[in-house]
Amino acid sequence: MKKIFFILLLLICGGGINAQLYTYPEGLRTGLPHNDDFTVRVRTKGGEWKETFEYKVQVDMDRVTDASMVQFDMDEPVEVMVKKNNGMIQQVDIRPYSKNIEYKQVKNCIFFTLDKPQYLSVEFNGDRLNNLHLFANPVETETYKESSEGVMYFGPGTHRPGDLPNNQIRIPSNTTVYLAPGAVVEAKLLVDHAENVRIIGRGIIYKAIRGIEVTDSKNVYIDGITVVNPDHYSIFGGGSKGITVRNFKAFSCKGWSDGIDVMSCQDIDIENIFMRNSDDCLAFYNHRWNWWGGTNHVNVRKAVLWADIAHPINIGGHGDPESEVGETIENLTFRDIDILEQDE
C-alpha cells in the first residue's frame, strides 16, 4: 500500500521531474557574431542559471543597427534574467504588451517569469533598435543525430553548399531536413517540383540569398527554423499547395527582404511566428513572375509582426491584367496578431 501511495505521489507531484529547458550551448561554436549588449540567463524555478548565446542580428534598412537575439526551449515555467551591459536602466518595455509580462528590476538587471513558450522584444530606455529579441520555443518533439535515408542532417557548426556559385541546397521529395541547435546553414534551401518535405529543428539559415524557397511543390512543413538577414525573402512560395509554417522567426534589413511571401498558392497555414523585416512581413499575391492563378485558403494565427519598413501584412499588389477570367485572393483568416511596428 505504501508503494502504491508513493507512485501516486510521484505522478501527482513529479511534473518537474521531466521538465526540460534547453539553451543551445552549441551556439558558442558556430562562429556567428556575438552581441555583448546584454547577458541573458534562464532557469527552471529555483534551479541553476543557464547561459544563453546572445546572437548579433541586424535590423532596420533605414539605419542598419545591431540588435540581439537569444533562443531556448522550455516546457514548464522558467525564470529569465536580462542584464544590460552598457548604460543604466531607466525604462523597460517587454512587447507585445498583450503578453502582460511583469518584471522586477535589480540595479542593471531585470527578472521575469515565462509560463509558456512565446516570442518577445525586450527594450530598454525606449530603444527599439538595439533591443533584445527573446525567443522561448516549445521543446522539440523530433530530433536526429545524423543523416539517413530520407533525412538530411545539419549538425552544430557552419554549413555551405558544394555548388557555391548557386548558393543553394536542393531538397528532394520525401525528405526531412533537420537543422540541429547550433547549426548554421549559409545557403538557400530550395524545394522545387517536390512534395512531402519537412524542414525542422532549431538551427539558423544565415545571410542566404533567400531563406527557404518553395516553388511548384506541395505538402511542405517548416517548423522551428530561424532565418537571419537574407538578401531577399525569408520564406518564398510560388505556385505551391499545402505550405505549413510553425514556430518560425526571421530578421531582415535590406530592400525587398520580405518575410513570408506567397504568390499563386493554396492552403497556407502559419502559426506562432515572429517576423522583423525591412519590407512586408507577410505578403499574399496572385500572378507574379513565373506563377499564375489566385491565392486562397490562407490561415495565419499567433503572429508577432514588426515591419521596420513597409507593411506587417500586404494583400494584393500583383496579378495578371491580361487574364480573361481574372485572379482572386480569397479565404484569408488572421487571428491573434500583434503588430509591433509599421513604418512607411
Model regions and ranges:
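Well-ordered, non-transmembrane segments within structured domains
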Residues: 150-175, 181-183, 188, 228-255
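Glycine-rich beta-solenoid repeat tracts in large extracellular/virion proteins
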Residues: 166-171, 184-193, 207-216, 233-239, ...
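Right-handed parallel beta-helix
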Residues: 174-176, 181, 195-205, 218-229, ...
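Generic structural hydrophobic/aromatic packing signal, biased to beta-strands
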Residues: 80-82, 112, 122, 134, ...
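Sec-dependent N-terminal signal peptides
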Residues: 4-13, 174
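Extracellular "leader-to-stem" segments immediately downstream of a signal peptide or signal-anchor
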Residues: 14, 18-173, 184-187, 193-198, ...
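Sterically constrained small-residue positions within well-ordered secondary structures
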Residues: 10, 71-73, 113, 145, ...
